[in-house]
Amino acid sequence: MDDVIRKRIEAVRRGEVPEGYSTGDAGVLPADWSSKPLSDISSVITEQAGDRDLETLSISAGIGFVNQAEKFGKEMSGKQYSKYTVLRKGDFAYNKGNSKKYPQGCTCMLKERDEAAVPNVFECFRIAVGDPLYYEQLFVHGFMNKQLARKINHGVRDDGLLNLTNEEFYSTVLPVPPLAEQQKIAKILSAYDRAIELKQKLVDELQSLKKTCLVKLFPRVGSDVPEVRFPGFTAPWEQRKVGTFTSVLSASRVHKDEWRTEGVPFFRSSDVVSAFKGDDNERAFISTELYEELVKSSGRLEKNDILITGGGSIGIPYIVPNNEPLYSKDADLIWIKKSEEHVSQFLFAYFTSQGFREYISGISHVGTIAHYTIEQVKDTPVSLPSIAEQSVVGSFFSRLNQLITLHQRELEAVQQKKKALMQLLLTGLVRVNV
């Protein structure tokens, strides 16, 4: 990023209007761009489905158009369907239903189908002037959200829709670059969309492979061998309870007023769940002095020990990655020590399998809160092969998890780069060569 662009961005952040730019309802834009209400660049779609046989779609927040029967489990009646609005490829539908991800509703473009019918509660339109793909990027970016938030009356109607009239929706003002620039912006951002789509597909395929392997590489109920084995192993697996091949413990209690903002990491169930999902979580700590006092009686967590959640989202595992100081919350997390009779990576993989999920759902104390206790962990049955086979199976899943994490991070990096580019290109803070 050159100095001119950097200074331009800094000026806008300070609330200033850079040279060559102007400000209006659509924000700070290049002086040679115009800004127009959506009503000036679009036409409202009123065509109804009638008795035509069209696929019916709905909008799912964060996904886009989905088959309505698959979403709701039923088709609409003929009387309702006849009033549905007909969309064609390139048309848009605005869903006034608010959600956590889209508090001002969301606008989607029909891209994967040539024609479809959508509920007439959606506001449907097509771009009459300009490049629809450019405007799609504006809608995806949520460019209208601030304006819509000012127009929407607080709360929702009895039908769950936002208090926003069609006139208010179409009065939102959008940036309108010259057509050639619209097309170039859309081309750049669409290329990122394709890269994101391909990377997401790879992540999904790896997740699907993992799910399949978790079924095939562990014995089914009633069997002592898995469906698929690595070469060189033929001996039956032995079913044992966790408490017979390792120690199952709990940490000493730490009161909340002893938590700190720095020091020794203090793991709770939320930290384990976040680590399992690859999400960030606000961390808690305890002082080094308290940690040293506690481990005198409870012992130290060591590399390859396993923590498994006993409250909240129960049965979620975490392998301690190193011997650096770490302490865990007592009832929240059950502590499974490493031992010579099991391989931690193998046991971790088992704790992520469908067989284990089915087992734990049947034995956990479920009331208002589910619990997985120390005694239940000790009594949990696990089919164990030889240490050598455990090592091979555990290493396979460990490498597969690392590969999934790598591609997930690459996906997130591309998504973040596109998000930053949208902010710059759709406001004209960075201009494209046409």
Predicted regions and their residues:
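Short, solvent-exposed loop/turn positions at domain surfaces
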Residues: T23, E75-Y81, D158, S190, ...
